[in-house]
Amino acid sequence: MSQTAMSETYDFLFKFLVIGNAGTGKSCLLHQFIEKKFKDDSNHTIGVEFGSKIINVGGKYVKLQIWDTAGQERFRSVTRSYYRGAAGALLVYDITSRETYNALTNWLTDARMLASQNIVIILCGNKKDLDTDREVTFLEASRFAQENELMFLETSALTGENVEEAFVQCARKILNKIESGELDPERMGSGIQYGDAALRQLRSPRRAQAPSAQECGC
């Protein structure tokens, strides 16, 4: 198998969203996650941007297809169409902007109404590197996350702190739901698909079959 083919082999594919107000650093989070560097010339997303990456979660290779949505109200009708069938989402606010935090409820309502029924969401308080300019405390956001059954991390797209961890935690919870039977990759609109590696395993005959009479030499 070629190196390219190997790099594209994965067990599952998850559709992810990155949502939240404009200026919270959503595109920078995506760029830091995929490229491992800060995108310092980032402009506001117009409509939707896309990125993908394969990660290892507990020995399973998961390909994340990530849709970075525009935060401006005028693009809301466009970006809502991309919510359908999302398995996971990063809900992002800026810890230095109370306004972006206050908008979280609206974004959360959209995600739970328009995406898949069992969408897994992690709340990300971005721009952790600007702690001296903080307007939203860790405790306040932590309570919001707990009340709304969200995971929660503070992140920094600039330094990379907790960026990969946010995506991995979200993916791990989705995997746990698959293993428990709560999520079915074969159900339409789940935001989850089996990858090539998992399909090969599902389709391969069981190795532990009883030997035939001819083989056993009876």
Curated annotation (Swiss-Prot):
SUPFAM superfamilies per record: P-loop containing nucleoside triphosphate hydrolases
GO BP of this protein: protein transport; Rab protein signal transduction; regulation of endocytosis; vesicle-mediated transport
Activity regulation, per record: Regulated by guanine nucleotide exchange factors (GEFs) which promote the exchange of bound GDP for free GTP. Regulated by GTPase activating proteins (GAPs) which increase the GTP hydrolysis activity. Inhibited by GDP dissociation inhibitors (GDIs).
Keyword Transport (UniProt): yes
SMART domains reported in the protein's UniProt record: ARF, RAB, RAN, RAS, RHO
Binding site for Mg(2+): S27, T45, D68
Chief site of localization: membrane
Modification 5-glutamyl serotonin occurs at: Q72
Keywords in alphabetical order: Cytoplasm, Endosome, GTP-binding, Hydrolase, Lipoprotein, Magnesium, Membrane, Metal-binding, Methylation, Nucleotide-binding, Phosphoprotein, Prenylation, Protein transport, Transport
Protein name, as recorded: Ras-related protein Rab-4A
